[in-house]
Amino acid sequence: MKKIVLPSIVMLIYSTLFAQHSLEKMWESDSLTLRNPESVLYDSKSNSLYVSSMSSGTIVRMDIDGKVIKKDWITGLTSNKGSALFNGLLYTAETSAVAVIDVDKATIVKRIPIEGAQMLNDVAVDSKGIFYVSDTRAGRVYRIEGDKPSVYLENMPGANGLLTINTDLYVLTSTSFQKVDANKVITKISDGFESGLDGIVMIGENEFVISNFQGILYYVRADGTKQLLLDTRTNRIMSNDISYNSKTKILYVPSFGTNRVIAYKVK
């Protein structure tokens, strides 16, 4: 009897630790409003989405069901991509500057230029209001404190998606997923991905979903184990800078080439 029960227990523990995740498609937005959506950001305060419509230099505001609240919520941006919220302000990356937007007034209040920037991409902010901005073309990450930018990390090929958790900064290069602590000690979490990693969200303790703009979504644990969640490359549906609603477990995925945002339930 013991010889039967013990393997059963082992298999139960194994299946619990390495349970497979899946995505269930909930909705997709229309393809007429957005022009090359590069990034989507969920705002828990307003329970809405801010979508960077890169080719039109605008931010489109949507509800959590993909319906447009305001098409031209913000205009006059230049190749806008990733965004982050802090104290009622939305910070969005342009080509060589970070635009600062007053959310309540829906106006651009200032820009923070970054000298030497080549292609700013994603933005993340920590609890102290210190911002981090990736420069994909230069392979750098900048740090902005008190509106003063400085080079924080270099030699990060294709630096793109950023995420702050406590004192750690998580960084996606083109093919790897890394953690950088407060002393700038770099730990490689997982690598060997196909070139084109883009966005990153945390979906649980030590659990992440990362995107590859070509059209791939991965589930990754902090110990480096990973699982392919979705591959839509054959349908030419891209997966760019993603966002996540932890209460509803909905993942929001902008698709640059098809001009849509697609929502998936994470299971």
Language model features with spans:
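Bacterial Sec-dependent N-terminal signal peptides
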Residues: 1-24
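Structural signal for beta-propeller blades
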Residues: 57-59, 98-100, 139-141, 177-178, ...
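Blade-level signature of beta-propeller repeat domains, shared across WD40, Kelch, NHL, RCC1
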Residues: 241-267
